[in-house]
């Protein structure tokens, strides 16, 4: 069967999209082209831009994508340099931002300029863990409590018996049990090195469930995720307990810089932040007590191959702005749930790996975990730059003007 015959059979449904590879001896690049051409024929459209790319489907299909037909290209800009005085990120960094929102890169760039001129951003990682919360059905609440207590007392045993069997980098460090009636939710916390770690902790949690069922034959493991993890959904537990990296970025911006570069005052920025980000968000019932964490997190995630659905939790957090006794501006952002990695998943895609290399965080660190922490500090610094610039634009009544100029 020649290529033209395969395209026709895919277009009319005789060959399913996921079956194409076996008709072309596993040539994934050719299979990608066939699927795209079959779709063009069936729908009567042109997909020439989707079909124009440099990355190799043979490296992606089966690892990052199924039924591949091409790529979506998102414009990528760079903001910076941003000076960061972190525990892992030390120096000046450029921030890759993939977005179609005009004015976003310019705004973050302005924030980077102001913060760097002010001496830079201080970043602090408060916590680092990835969680998974399996659901166990128990005969009653007392049995659920007994199981929870046993698990808390046997973390080292579970690490050796279960976790170490399936991962070299994952380490079970804690568990927080939640009991609802006769249902037990075990929110396991793991260290995952430079990986974001969801696959790692999912596989490890399943091994732990096998051990628990052996130890307690009268309980039943029902779901590997009981939704108390919590992954890819707005939620309070991550906001309070954290998931991924919990990180703070802060800076003091002298009044002169606020007035000359940002065209406003520390007092106005503090007032806008309080009544917009704190009071307004409280009235809305939002977990985003901030101006636009999600804008910067989303643009960096798309550029660097992070799990884009976890932009949800990355948008959670609090911005604080206040006038110091000296009359300058103190500004900080706190991100409780920044779920990122520098190895695995989409970070293997060549374009995304190149974006990570712009910040000097591509691949694993030595020791494991330091690259992901460095990356977290850079992201937090960029988010602070974005918050500072947008709050200043709102305070100066420049927001609409900027979008008229750059956002059409």
From Swiss-Prot:
Keyword annotations for this protein, in alphabetical order, are: Isoprene biosynthesis, NADP, Oxidoreductase
Entry GO MF terms: hydroxymethylglutaryl-CoA reductase (NADPH) activity
Q: Which residues form the active site?
A: 101, 307, 403
- One Pfam short name: HMG-CoA_red
Could you say which EC number(s) this protein's record lists? 1.1.1.34
Please give the SUPFAM superfamilies that the UniProt record associates with this protein. Answer: NAD-binding domain of HMG-CoA reductase (SSF55035), Substrate-binding domain of HMG-CoA reductase (SSF56542)
The signal sequence is none
Q: Which reaction does it catalyse?
A: (R)-mevalonate + 2 NADP(+) + CoA = (3S)-3-hydroxy-3-methylglutaryl-CoA + 2 NADPH + 2 H(+)
Q: Does the keyword NADP apply?
A: yes
Task: Please state the pathway this protein functions in, per its UniProt record.
Answer: Metabolic intermediate biosynthesis; (R)-mevalonate biosynthesis; (R)-mevalonate from acetyl-CoA: step 3/3
What GO biological process terms does the UniProt entry carry, in alphabetical order?
A: coenzyme A metabolic process; isoprenoid biosynthetic process; sterol biosynthetic process
Q: Which EC main class describes this enzyme?
A: oxidoreductase
Q: Which family does it belong to?
A: Belongs to the HMG-CoA reductase family.
Q: Report the NCBIfam families cross-referenced here.
A: HMG_CoA_R_NADP
Q: What does this protein do?
A: Converts HMG-CoA to mevalonate.
Q: What is this protein called?
A: 3-hydroxy-3-methylglutaryl-coenzyme A reductase
Q: Which organism is it from?
A: Pyrococcus abyssi (strain GE5 / Orsay)
């Amino acid at each position: 069967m020649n290529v033209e015959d395969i395209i026709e059979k895919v277009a009319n449904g005789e060959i399913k999209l996921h079956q194409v590879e076996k008709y072309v001896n596993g040539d994934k690049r050719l299979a990608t082209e066939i699927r795209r051409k079959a779709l063009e024929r069936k729908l009567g459209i042109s997909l020439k831009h989707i079909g124009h790319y440099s990355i190799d489907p043979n490296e992606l299909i089966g690892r990052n994508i199924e039924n591949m037909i091409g790529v979506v290209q998102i414009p990528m800009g760079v903001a910076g340099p941003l000076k960061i005085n972190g525990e892992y990120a030390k120096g000046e960094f450029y921030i890759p931002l993939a977005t179609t929102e005009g004015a976003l890169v310019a705004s973050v760039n302005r924030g980077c300029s102001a913060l760097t001129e002010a001496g830079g951003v201080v970043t602090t990682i408060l916590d680092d863990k990835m969680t998974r919360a399996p659901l166990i059905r128990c005969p009653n609440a007392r049995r659920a409590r007994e199981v929870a207590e046993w698990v808390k007392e046997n973390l080292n045993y579970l690490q050796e018996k279960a976790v170490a069997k399936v991962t070299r980098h994952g380490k079970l460090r804690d568990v927080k049990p939640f009991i609802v009636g006769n249902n037990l939710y075990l929110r396991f916390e793991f260290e995952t090195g430079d990986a974001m770690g969801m696959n790692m902790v999912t596989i490890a949690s399943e091994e732990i469930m096998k051990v628990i069922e052996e130890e307690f034959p009268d309980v039943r493991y029902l779901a590997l995720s009981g939704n108390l993890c919590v992954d890819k959904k707005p939620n309070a537990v991550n906001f309070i307990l954290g998931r991924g990296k919990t990180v703070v970025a802060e800076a003091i911006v002298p009044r002169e810089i606020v007035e000359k570069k940002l065209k406003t005052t520390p007092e106005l920025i503090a007032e806008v932040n309080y009544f917009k980000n704190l009071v307004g968000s409280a009235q809305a019932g939002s977990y985003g007590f901030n101006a636009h964490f999600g804008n910067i997190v989303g643009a960096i995630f798309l550029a660097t191959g992070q799990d884009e659905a976890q932009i949800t939790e990355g948008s959670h957090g609090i911005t604080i702005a206040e006038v110091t006794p000296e009359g300058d501006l103190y500004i900080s952002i706190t991100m409780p749930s920044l779920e990122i990695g520098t190895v695995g998943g989409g970070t293997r895609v060549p374009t995304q790996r190149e974006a990570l290399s712009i910040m000097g965080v591509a691949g694993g660190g030595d020791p494991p975990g330091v690259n992901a922490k460095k990356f977290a500090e850079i992201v937090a610094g960029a988010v602070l730059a974005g918050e500072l610039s947008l709050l200043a634009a709102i305070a100066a009544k420049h927001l609409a003007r900027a979008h008229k100029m750059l956002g059409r």
